Amino acid sequence: MEPSHKDAETAAAAAAVAAADPRGASSSSGVVVQVREKKGPLRAAIPYMPFPVAVICLFLNTFVPGLGTFVSAFTVLCGARTDLPDRHVCCVFWLNIAAALIQILTAIVMVGWIMSIFWGMDMVILAISQGYKEQGIPQQL
């Protein structure tokens, strides 16, 4: 396949830019960009738990879909923090119960089981990130 005329022009333009820039083709100035994940209400209701509890919930979610999420709902009642600070504790509790029910009911078609495992992984990731924040260690994920 022969390169088209447009491809040749693009390559020539890139070569001209690279020759004009002594640092190479890239002209980035080292700007730091911060990205924040926008979470839905169910995802934001996942509590920040201690690491061992999060691992137990992941284990439970792996073998009995929704059970770890159900257990994590009760950690909200015990004071676990979530990303929904403006919602009442009971509302966050019921959001977690709803997530557990969704996982249980859709486990029949494997969707709930996979969702349950990912939910447990999110619990562990949140527990790890919370541990880093408490210790003041810079975090790289």
From Swiss-Prot:
Its localization reads:
Membrane
Question: From which domain of life does this come?
Answer: Eukaryota
Phosphoserine is found on 26
Annotated organism of origin: Homo sapiens
For whether the record's keyword set contains Membrane, the answer is yes
Q: What is this protein called?
A: Protein stum homolog
| Gene Ontology cellular component list | membrane
Q: Could you tell me which InterPro entries the record lists for this protein? A: SPEC3/Stum (IPR026673)
Q: How does it sit in the membrane?
A: Multi-pass membrane protein
Lineage of source species: Eukaryota, Metazoa, Chordata, Craniata, Vertebrata
Q: Please name the PANTHER family in this protein's record.
A: PROTEIN STUM, PROTEIN STUM HOMOLOG
Q: Which family does it belong to?
A: Belongs to the SPEC3 family. Stum subfamily.
UniProt keyword annotations, A-Z = Membrane, Phosphoprotein, Transmembrane, Transmembrane helix
Q: Where are the transmembrane segments?
A: 51-71, 87-107
What gene is it encoded by? STUM
Using the UniProt record, give the first listed, main subcellular location.
Answer: membrane
Which Pfam families has this protein been placed in?
A: Spec3
